Amino acid sequence: MPRKKQTSPKEVTPALLKFREKRKWQINYRRYVLEESPCPFYAPYFGLDIKNLRQWFEYQFTGDLRWDNFGKKWQFDHVIPVTYFDFANEEELKMCWNFTNIRVEKFQLNKDRGNRLDVLNAKNYFKELLEKTNYAVCLKLLSKIDEIEVSDFVNTEAQQ
């Protein structure tokens, strides 16, 4: 019987590398929050220790949302989606994975938000948080939204 040919490994493209990097961060974030597993490398990017980060999410629980139904009834959601951040830039990583940029999102049927940024809601959210807390990361995230808006405007103009 002839040997089965091995399939060649996936070609390593910049997009694949970016996907793998994002996935690595997502996995470590879940381990940190859900499994309460300390991670000295990633923890500084999250902005809070495990106990306080879990409380941050618990404040957002509504109705029947609980830790034991993560992945079934709710998930973590980035206010500014991950795709807008450059993982090669340390400051961008700190903004992307900061607790203020991640919230509880209840699963909804037929919802397909994808990687779109709801600019108005995101701006209002970070402005309100900045006013209440004076937390500097909120100001940086507001600047990031402005940067995204300018970039989207330039791209739209270039297409016309």
Regions found by a protein language model. Give the residues of each.
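Contiguous alpha-helical segments
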Residues: 1-70, 75
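Extended charged
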Residues: 1-12, 16, 71, 123-160
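A generic "cationic amphipathic patch" detector
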Residues: 40, 70, 89, 115-119
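General structural signal for secondary-structure boundaries
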Residues: 48-49, 61, 91, 106-107, ...
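Histidine-centered catalytic micro-motifs used for acid/base chemistry in nuclease
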Residues: 56-90, 102-107
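Immediate flanking context of iron-sulfur cluster ligation sites
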Residues: 91-97
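Short Cys/His-centered divalent metal-binding micro-motifs
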Residues: 98-130
